[in-house]
Each structure stands twice: as C-alpha cells, then as structure tokens.
C-alpha cells in the first residue's frame, strides 16, 4: 500500500472511531457531537492527500484485500475503487458534512438525543462513502441500502409527529420500488455474466440487453426522486433541517444519479436506455420546477429545486455526458447545503416559521444569512462565475450541440428559466420588503457555529466550481466552436427568468385574484400526484377489497352457497314428498275462521 491508499484508509478509520466510541461512556458525554464534528474535519483534511495525488498523476487504484465469500463460481471480495469519481466526491462529501454537523451543534443543541443524532449523521455519511467507493455491485448494494435505512431514521427523527413518521415511511416505500430494480439487475448480472465486479461487467459485454439497464434506471428513479417516484422528496422536509441539507447535497438523492454514472460504459452503447433517461430527466426537471413556483414552505421550495437539478443531471447522462453530470453533483452539493442551512437559520430564528409569506425584511435583521441565501440562490440559477455556472452552463451547451430530442432540450431550457423565477421569489418574500413576523421575536445570528458553517459553504459556492473545473481534466473532447447565440443560451434563459420574477413581483402588489387559476392549483397540489397516489388509489383498493370480502365472500360463501342452497334443497324435497305444505299459520287461521262460522250459525 502506498500513500494514496493509506491516506484513504486513515480517513475511513477516523470516521469509524466515533461509531466505536458510541459503545463506551464517551457516548453519554455532552462533548460527543464536538468529537464527531472534529473527526469529520480531520477526515476531510486527510482525504485531500489522495485527491491531490490523483489530480497530479491521474492514476486510478483498486484495493481488493479481503476475500468475502464464494457462491458456486461467483466470487465476492471487499474491493474499493479509488478513481476519478470516488476521489473527487469523497472530500466534497466530507467538507459539506463537516459544515452541516457544525450547524447541527447550534440547531439541535436542545434536543435530548443529540448524541444519537450525530451518530446517525455520521453513519449516513459512511454508508454513502461505501456506495461511492464500492468496486462490486454487492458492496454498492450495502451502501445503497445503508443510505436508505439511515434516511428513514433521520427523516422520522421527531417520531412524536405523525407527519414525520408518514414522511419516513413514504421515503422507504418509494425506495423499495427502486430497490426491486436494483435486485433484478443484480440477478441478471449474476445469471448471465456470473460476476458482480464492475470491471468484469464492463469488459465482458458492452452491447448488453436493455433489461438490467431498465432495472438500474428504476433504481435511480426511486433513489433520485425522478418523475413517478418523486413524492417522497418534498415530504422528507419533515425531518430536521440538517438532515434535509445532508440528504439533498452529498448523500441519498445523488446516489441514484451516481449509480448511472458508474454504469455509463454500459449506457453509452444503448441508445434506448439513454433516450429513456433523457426524457425522464427532462420531465422531472420541468415538473418539479413548476411545483416549486407556488410553494410557500421555504424548505419545500429548496427541496423541489433539488429534484429539478437531479432531473438536469439525468438529462446530462441521457446526452452521454456522465462526467459533466458528476461535475454538477459536486458543484450542486455546496450551494444546496448552504441554502438549507440558511433556511434552517431563518426557521430557527423565527420560532419554527417556515411560511415565506410570514417573513420579509430579513436582510436588515439577518444580514449574514440573507447574503448567503442570495449567493446560494444565484449559484443555483447558474449566475456567471459562481459555482453553479461552471457545470450548468456546460450542460446547456452540451444539450444544445448534441443530436438529441428537441423537446427534451426545450423543456430543460424552460425549467432552467423557472429556476431563476422561484429563486428570486424566495429572495423577494423572505429577505426584502417589510417584516411580516411578530415584533416580539428576538433574532440573533451571532453564533460562531452558525456563521462558520455557512461561511465555509458560501466560499465553496463562489470558488469551488472554478477550482474543480480547472483542476480536473475532461475525459472527453469538449465542443471547440459554437455560435455566440448557442453559447449564451443558458445565460439568456436565466436572465429571462429573473425578469419574469421581477415583473410578477410588481404585478402581485396590484393584482387581486378573485378565483384561483387551475394552473395554480395544479402547481400547488403537486400535479395532484400525491392526492391520486396516496388518497384516491388506496381508497379504491380498500373499498374494492372491502366489497370483495363482504359482498363476494361473505354473501356468496357463508350465506348463499351453503345455507341457502341446503334450505332450498330441503324445501324442494319436502314439497315433492308430502302433500302438506307445512303452513302452520294458515292452518290455524282456516281452523279459527271455520270455528267462528260454526259458532255464528249455531247461535
């Protein structure tokens, strides 16, 4: 082992130490969160060593030391793939998690189980790193399921609330659907290729059938909340804000996109799979951008922006630019984590108020948070020379110049424009204007835990894109020439979005809507998707099963089939054999009438 692999091992050991310490008395110490946060910061510093070595040498490494098991001829080893993707993603994930943990020490300080919370956050990070560095599908599946179960525990952290429990259950159920696809792909590779090692899969068969790729796409759809399996993502906002920040920036939701990036050697030879990914991503990015326009919960707006960016990453994979999608994952982590931390800062300061209509004027009372939120929103829209610009602009350029579906490109451009609209809406509602919150609320953002964490991410949101795009050489040939109007398309649609938002803001001061528009209802009710999937379909299933149980089974089997049939047979037999009908009441009545007639005649 050399310095490259040794420093990676040291980073992992440092991260595991607080987990081991949780089985001792240290876990009961009030300083445990500080230990966890410090461990992550040390792990980040050490993880820079292999990353810098990789940047200097561009030498990938695969570490495979421990033979796990052999099932017939299928050999499983614990192997780590230290390549372009894992070496670049690991320090970014550690840096973002370090900032989120420092923020959590301020945000969750009054929580009685804060030590357990930090332990869960750390386990969440470790499972994501297992997923990123895995060199075989089984190891990747362990990390995949790990982030799933940790997200369930963290989204449902405030388990006394019904909404939190429902959201956690929703997240795990939607991910179960995706996991079916992953398991089907595992089974196909085991049966047909007899291996789960990534290198062997890529070498053995490049012209692979669509079936395992469909399984992988289904898995990515569930984990990365693409259209159809997306409702769990906004619901996941019921968890604490640090959980939302970690979930949306560098863990969980990017795992699905990362899976497809890992398998790009198979996808690039299958145009059907690429077209499917492109269309799925384009629909997702537009639909979620439309939903974000009318939301009033600040965290849900940021959550829908995540889903929209995930759709953009899927579009990038669909046009066969996996390295560009990965670059967007890396740049997106910084400003998305910062947007959530700024939202958490505002929510905490306003006594857990999340409605942007009840905010306003925060640039006066919370200047630091307001500045960071503005930087994050501008980076999200792809403002030139902020972090988001370096990946988003390239994605739009690549989509413009690729032989792709024109509708997918138009949809992506509209969604990019809408990103600017809802980002500006947050700034207008939350930061500008007059305060709309109670005057008695005391606002104080002068806490080093809060300021330092947001400050680091703000610096990342400004400089990280420039550093990443300049340090890492592209693995494919970029477009050398391009007309000016195509080059400026991304900037043009973003500025158009800002202009629309400004105009809408001016109009909203004077316009009074008498009735709600159906388009507004469609956007505000999330396309009626949750209502249909979570209310109408379960109700129809329940009523159908109830009718089947009561009407079909009970009435047919326990009433008509046996008792009624037996009685009908007995009656038919008795009437056939006997001349008497057995009508006792009629006999008594005729006897009474004849008796009365006789008495009447005699008297």
UniProtKB/Swiss-Prot annotation:
One of its GO terms (biological process) is electron transport coupled proton transport. The keyword Disulfide bond does not apply. It is a multi-pass membrane protein. The chain crosses the membrane at residues 3-23, 38-58, 87-107, 114-134, 138-158, 171-191, 201-221, 241-261, 273-293, 301-320, 325-347, 366-386, 409-429, 457-477, 482-502, 582-602. Its main location: mitochondrion. It is found in: Mitochondrion inner membrane. GO terms for molecular function: NADH dehydrogenase (ubiquinone) activity. Keywords: Electron transport, Membrane, Mitochondrion, Mitochondrion inner membrane, NAD, Respiratory chain, Translocase, Transmembrane, Transmembrane helix, Transport, Ubiquinone. One of its GO terms (cellular component) is respiratory chain complex I. PANTHER family: NADH-UBIQUINONE OXIDOREDUCTASE CHAIN 5. Core subunit of respiratory chain NADH dehydrogenase (Complex I) which is composed of 45 different subunits. Core subunit of the mitochondrial membrane respiratory chain NADH dehydrogenase (Complex I) which catalyzes electron transfer from NADH through the respiratory chain, using ubiquinone as an electron acceptor. Essential for the catalytic activity and assembly of complex I. Belongs to the complex I subunit 5 family. This is NADH-ubiquinone oxidoreductase chain 5. It comes from Oryctolagus cuniculus. The lineage of its organism: Eukaryota, Metazoa, Chordata, Craniata, Vertebrata.
């Amino acid at each position: 082992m050399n310095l490259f692999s040794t420093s990676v091992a040291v980073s992992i050991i440092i991260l595991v130490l607080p987990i081991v310490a949780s089985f001792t008395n240290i876990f009961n110490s009030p300083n445990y969160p500080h230990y966890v946060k410090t461990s992550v910061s040390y792990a980040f510093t050490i993880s820079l060593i292999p990353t810098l070595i990789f940047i200097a040498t561009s030498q990938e490494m695969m570490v495979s030391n421990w033979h796990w098991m052999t099932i017939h001829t299928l050999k499983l080893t614990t192997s780590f793939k230290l390549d372009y993707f894992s070496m670049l993603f690991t320090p970014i994930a550690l840096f973002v998690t370090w900032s989120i943990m420092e923020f959590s020490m301020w945000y969750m300080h009054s929580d009685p189980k804060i030590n357990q919370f930090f332990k869960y956050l750390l386990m969440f990070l470790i499972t994501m790193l297992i997923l990123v560095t895995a060199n075989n599908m089984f190891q990747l599946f362990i990390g995949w399921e790990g982030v799933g179960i940790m997200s369930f525990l963290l989204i449902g952290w405030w388990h006394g609330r019904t909404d939190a429990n429902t959201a956690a259950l929703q997240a795990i159920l939607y991910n179960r659907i995706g996991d079916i696809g992953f398991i089907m792909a595992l089974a196909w590779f085991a049966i047909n290729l007899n291996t789960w090692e990534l290198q062997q899969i890529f070498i053995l068969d490049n012209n692979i059938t669509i079936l395992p790729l469909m399984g992988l796409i289904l898995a990515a759809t569930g984990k990365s909340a693409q259209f159809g399996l997306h409702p769990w993502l906004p619901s996941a906002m019921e968890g604490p804000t640090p959980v939302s920040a970690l979930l949306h920036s560098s863990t969980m939701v990017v795992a699905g996109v990362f899976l497809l990036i890992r398998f790009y050697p198979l996808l690039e030879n299958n145009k059907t799979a690429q077209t499917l990914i492109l269309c799925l991503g384009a629909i997702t990015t537009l639909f979620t951008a439309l939903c974000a326009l009318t939301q009033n919960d600040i965290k849900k707006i940021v959550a829908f922006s995540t889903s929209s960016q995930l759709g953009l990453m899927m579009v990038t994979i669909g046009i066969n630019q996996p390295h560009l999608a990965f670059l967007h994952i890396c740049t997106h982590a910084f400003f998305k984590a910062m947007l959530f931390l700024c939202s958490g800062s505002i929510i905490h300061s306003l006594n857990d108020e999340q409605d942007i209509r009840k905010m306003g004027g925060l640039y006066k009372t919370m200047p630091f948070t307001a500045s960071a939120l503005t930087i994050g929103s501008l980076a999200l829209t792809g403002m030139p020379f902020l972090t988001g610009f370096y990946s988003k602009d390239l994605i739009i350029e690549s989509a413009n110049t690729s032989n792709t579906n024109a509708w997918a490109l138009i949809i992506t451009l509209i969604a990019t424009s809408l990103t600017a609209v809802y980002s500006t809406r947050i700034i207008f509602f939350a930061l500008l204007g007059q305060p709309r919150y109670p005057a008695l609320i005391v606002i104080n953002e002068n806490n080093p835990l809060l300021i330092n964490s947001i400050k680091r991410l703000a610096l990342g949101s400004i400089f990280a894109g420039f550093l990443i795009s300049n340090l890492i050489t592209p693995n494919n040939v970029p477009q050398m020439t391009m007309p000016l109007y195509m080059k400026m398309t991304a900037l043009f649609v973003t500025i158009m979005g800002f202009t629309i938002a400004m105009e809408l803001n001016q109009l909203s001061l004077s316009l009074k809507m008498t009735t709600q528009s159906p388009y507004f209802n469609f956007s505000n009710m999330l396309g009626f998707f949750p209502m249909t999937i979570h209310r109408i379909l379960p109700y129809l299933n329940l009523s159908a099963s109830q009718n089947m149980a009561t009407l079909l089974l009970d009435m047919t089997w326990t009433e008509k089939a046996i008792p009624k049939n037996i009685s009908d047979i007995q009656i038919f037999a008795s009437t056939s054999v006997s001349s008497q009908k057995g009508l006792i009441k009629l006999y008594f009545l005729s006897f009474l009438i004849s008796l009365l007639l006789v008495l009447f005649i005699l008297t």
